[in-house]
Amino acid sequence: MYLLRGAPKGDGPIVRLIGSGPIMVQVLDAVEKLEAYGIRSEIYSATSYGELRREGLACDRWNRLHPSKTAKKPWVEQLLGNAEVPVVAVSDNMAAVPDMIRQWVRGHFTVLGTDGFGRSDTREALRRFFEIDGKAV
């Protein structure tokens, strides 16, 4: 995971948005809509939620086995840090995929995903249905 774009300088509320793959277009669309309301956005790209989870679990295990040493912080926690800023993760997958990093995200964490099956339509219509389009984000 990496910071794709930092929040613009200024006052007002801020939110952290995490996207991955093709859904990043929807995240960028949401940024424009949020800016119209005076909300600044940091944009992160998650290249692999599975790898982030494995790394987080490895840090947790190391900390458990070495209680007298300085604790290791998982990459997600290092990158997102501040619990004051809400985080929204958006995925074309089931919500369970980005939810794999929940335990290392401090503060309010919302996951938007495509839970469900048996749907057939255009990508735009499906993203609207599952509420993962730019407007819903």
What name fits each language-model region?
Residues 1-136:
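Thiamine diphosphate
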